[in-house]
Structure formats: structure tokens, C-alpha cells
Amino acid sequence: TQIVNGVLTNQGVIPSTSPAARLRGGSELQPEESTNYTLGAYLSIGAFDVTADYFFINVEDRLNLSSDFTLTPADLATLTNQGIDASDISEFRFFTNQFETDTSGIDVVVSTDTEWLNGITNWQLAFNITTTEVVDRDPTLFDNDRVLLIQDGTPGTRWNFTANHNINQWRLLARINYYGDFYDNEAGGYFDDALLLDLEAAYTLDENMTFTVGARNVADEQGCSTSSCGTTPPSAFGLPYSQFSPFGFNGAFYYARFTYNLD
């Protein structure tokens, strides 16, 4: 049971070969077939180490859930004549192979070390851009909303920049994480991009003991709410934030850790 437009609705995932699914084009599932290519390079440019990787993945007969379907009175009558009572299913969907996607992207990592402030800082920038396109589909099984979820349901761009400074017995870390915007089909719209900051400090007491304190998402970023992002409805399943958020919606997380090495 799920909430659809504020109403409790019986909704389920049924076998693709069940009589109800066959009325909407369901069939036996087939193995996915994929072709992928990768190309990588490493460069040392002065004090900088650079790695770059390109990837391309084509998936035919891709497995995913279909769009949501309802049964008409004529459908219910057809199933009843087959001895099947489907009156308690208001909406349903099923797994299907009826679409094909192309996914491509680039990963770049740049790192270097700097001696300063009586210690050494390792700097690292990791960048990713990924795009997915639905290149073929059966529109009766896979509607435009499902296409948007596959293509834009995760951020197309992500990067993080990390500074890790070591000085005597101390290690200090700061990291900025960026997530691009993404689509949530349940909320009916796009959610804004976001920047998160992580901080950590560790002190090595001796060769066996280390004490660490830190915080993930220091600024307590929860992402924009469904209403502030302009999505419809103003909440999805009662959640004020997207259930698909790549960084969650619980905000800041603080921790302390003591490590003892038995060696």
C-alpha cells in the first residue's frame, strides 16, 4: 500500500508473466546484454599526478520496473473469466526488458603534495560526469516519467576536493563534496544541486593508538525540500525531502573514534 495523490492505494510489483501483467504487455524476462569500452590515461605534470578514465556502456534488454498500470473494468472482467480475482489491486507494475540505454562518462583525479605549515598536505580533486540516455523503449511499458528517472534520477556531475594535512602526530582533513541536481519521479520534479563539507582531526598518541573526531556534512545540508524545489506534490510519501537524495536527508553527523592496533 502506498500514498498516491494523498490516497492510500493498493500497489504491487507482480510477476511479468502473470495474467494481469500480460494484459499490459508483460512477458518472460531475458538476460541483459551489455557492451562496454574504457580508456584510461595517467599523466605526471610537474608536481601533479593526473588520472583520466572514459567509459561507455550499452545495455540491451535492460531490466527495470515498468510504469504503473491500472486495470479497467473490462480487464477485471477478462481476468474474472479466467478465474482470477484482481479486484484488490488498484495499481501494479512489473519487471521488463523492453528498453535500451547508453551510459558514458569521465572520471578525473588530480593530486599533489605541498610542504608547508611545518607539515605536508595532500591535495586531491576527484571529478565525475556521467550521462545516461534511453535510446530505445516500448512506450506502452516505459513512459516518459520512467525515462526521466533513468536518465536524471542521479546527479550527472559529482566532484570532491580534499585537503589532508599531516603535521607531527596530527592529521587534519577537510573535504568539499558537490552533487548535481537530480530528478525524483515521486515528487514530480528536479531537486537542486548541493555542497557538503566534511571535517576530521586525528591525533596519534603512539604507534598503536589514535583518537579521531570529525563531522560529515558540517553545515547540516539536507537539500531543498519538495516545496522549495518547486516540485509537485509538496511532499512525497510524507517526506519533506527527496527519498532519492544522493547524500541523504539526515543532515550533519558527528563522531569520535578511538583506534588501537594490536600489532
Q: What residue spans do the PLM features occupy?
A:
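Solvent-exposed loop segments that connect transmembrane elements
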Residues: 1-25, 68-94, 137-148, 224-246
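Repeated loop/turn-to-beta-strand initiation elements of outer-membrane beta-barrel proteins
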Residues: 47-50, 117-121, 169-173, 207-213
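Extracellular protease catalytic domains of secreted zymogens
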Residues: 190
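Residues on the lipid-exposed face of transmembrane beta-strands in outer-membrane beta-barrel proteins
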Residues: 39-43, 108-112, 161-165, 199-203, ...
